[in-house]
Regions:
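Active-site-proximal segment of zinc-dependent metalloprotease catalytic domains
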Residues: 1-169, 176-181, 250-252, 256, ...
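Non-catalytic C-terminal accessory/binding modules of secreted extracellular proteins
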Residues: 2, 74-116, 183-345
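Conserved aromatic anchor
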Residues: 354-367
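Extracellular low-complexity, O-glycosylation-prone stalks/linkers
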Residues: 365-384
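Solvent-exposed segments in extracellular or luminal domains encompassing
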Residues: 396, 485-493
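Beta-strand-rich modules
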Residues: 398-415
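Hydrophobic beta-strand segments within extracellular beta-sandwich modules
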Residues: 407, 495-497
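Extracellular fibronectin type III
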Residues: 414-429, 507
Length: 516
């Protein structure tokens, strides 16, 4: 990004202590007067109408670089605190050369250590504050120790976090995928199955996005190379961000004294104020990271990112993305490469009153595995079964009619890594006062009701309670469901269900099956 300025030195009519005075509810309460006074002095030889690039009637931004030190560095309270603001928020109006002056940014000439050792300030704070004028948000913890304590935010990887202070402000980081997404200035591709090589995001603005099923919640993927402006970023690699701009609750705000939604946190400059509920966070390759390099993929023992890895590729509600990044690696040219796969693909189309058939397929690259763990829960009771690596289907029995369940299939690799996929389903309704019948819905049938040879029948009885056992016969010979949970109809014949109830009674239901 390249920005051009017209600059002019001005001496304001009042002392710094006047403009920099702090009130009980805000810092630099009269700073808007400094902006107005500076613009009025500059209007003699600056045509403000030339600085409305989007023709919205407003000057795009006025930047005031104040002589002296910054209150943010610990200098006296008379000094200015770097900031971006709008004149209208202070009730001020200024019109010059037919344009409205509204947006302003202020930074300071000198950096210091708690008001001592003054030195020329680096460009970091300048770039940070100017970025607010472009629409970027503060991504550090803006309420400090409030709202549960200091949140890590984006560490020093981001210009909008502590990265603006890298190398004493002399080496602020490049714009990242979050910045490009907010600005609409990058090249964004949706994460899909395939092989990827991402160049450092500063080279071409290219990054990836994965949108969860929750509107406003998504993941971003970018490559960062530890060189140039990003030199302070360890060894670089793949960074993963989890962004939440949804309407979901995002915790209590000490500053506002109420619960805020994630969307409100973005509106109110409270994005990363809660350590337990950040709305723009790095999914660190090492969740216990204490060193910046531990944020990046790959690291020792961590070359994959999926639903069962640590960290996990899951939404705030715990739902699996269904995708996994495999074989993440750095390349000599600074890029990163990886493959994206769907390790497990679920199908729960066979849903009955008391059972469900769970089927799955796996990515061919994950064939070297120990087997599968199938789990199902109604939110209270949880059950699991371990299956051989050759299995691709499992019938869950003993379910309750009209009940919501969540099923998960975990692929267990030979090295103990796991990948999973989950899906919700609701069992069918039990109809009181109706007779039991053989359930045939969903089978492949012709318009005249005959079955297509090769049709699948689930061998299930509906509307029967207190059943101890059901035995199935086709043309008098015993039959049972195959490995996929279904019986395959290959010819015409008579299907019979012998039902044995817990009270000792028995019942037979017969259905003529015709194929064509």
């Amino acid at each position: 990004m390249r920005v051009q300025f017209r600059h002019r030195p001005v001496t304001l009519p009042k002392d710094l202590s006047y403009y920099g005075a702090n009130y009980s509810d805000r810092k630099d309460a009269l700073l808007y007067e400094a902006v107005r006074d500076a613009c009025l002095q500059s209007s003699e030889d600056i045509d403000f109408s030339a600085y409305d690039n989007d023709s919205d009637g407003e000057v795009d931004n006025v930047f005031i670089l104040v002589a002296g030190m910054s209150e943010a560095d610990g200098a006296s309270s008379d000094c200015i605190w770097p900031q971006h603001g709008l004149l209208k928020d202070s009730g001020a109006e200024l019109h010059l050369d037919g344009k409205t002056v509204n947006s302003f940014t202020v930074s300071c000439e000198l950096a210091s250590d708690e008001g001592s050792a003054p030195r020329p300030a680096g460009i970091g704070i300048f770039c940070h504050e100017l970025s607010h004028a472009f629409g970027l948000k503060d991504l550090y913890d803006t309420d400090g120790t409030g709202s549960g304590g200091n949140a890590p935010g984006l560490w020093n990887t981001s210009l909008m976090d502590t990265g603006c202070k890298n190398a004493d402000g002399m080496c602020p980081p490049n714009l990242n995928a979050i910045d490009y997404e907010l600005l609409g200035a990058g090249i964004c591709d949706t994460l899909e199955i395939g092989d990827y090589t991402l160049e450092p995001v500063n080279r071409n603005g290219h990054y990836l996005i994965f949108e969860t099923g929750n509107e406003g919640e998504y993941f971003l993927f970018e490559c960062r190379e530890a060189s140039g402006w990003d030199a302070p970023l360890g060894q670089g690699g793949l960074l993963v961000y989890h962004i939440d701009m949804s309407e979901d609750s995002a915790g209590y705000s000490d500053y506002y004294g109420r619960e805020l939604s994630a969307a409100e946190r973005w509106e109110l400059d409270q994005i990363n104020c809660r350590p337990d509920r950040q709305c723009a966070e790095i999914v660190a390759a090492d969740p216990t990271a204490t060193d910046i390099q531990d944020l990046f993929f790959p690291r020792e023992g961590v070359t994959n990112f999926g639903s069962e890895t640590v960290p996990a590729f899951r939404g705030n509600d715990g739902s699996s993305s269904g995708f996994a990044l495999l074989g993440i690696r750095r390349n000599q040219d600074g890029s990163v490469s990886f493959s994206v796969a769907r390790p497990v693909v679920l199908d729960i189309s066979g849903i009955f009153q008391d059972a469900a058939i769970i089927s799955w397929e796996i990515d061919d690259r994950l064939a070297d595995n120990q087997g599968f763990e199938v789990e199902w829960t109604d939110g209270e009771k949880r059950e699991t079964r371990m299956l051989d690596s050759s299995e691709r289907s499992f019938t869950v029995e003993g379910l309750t009619p009209q009940t919501r369940y969540r099923a998960t299939v975990r692929l267990v690799m030979s090295d103990e890594q796991k990948f999973s996929m989950s899906a919700n389903f609701t069992t069918k309704v039990y109809r009181e006062g109706t007779y039991p019948y053989i359930y045939l819905r969903g089978s492949d049938r012709n318009t005249d009701g005959t079955f297509v040879p090769g049709s699948k029948i689930p061998l299930r009885i509906f509307n029967a309670t207190g059943v101890a056992e059901v035995r199935w016969f086709f043309d008098g010979s015993p039959v049972e469901a195959e490995s996929d949970g279904y019986f395959t109809v290959r010819r015409s014949g008579t299907l019979c269900a012998e039902i044995y109830y817990e009270d000792g009674t028995e019942e037979r239901i017969i259905k003529e099956i015709r194929t064509r």
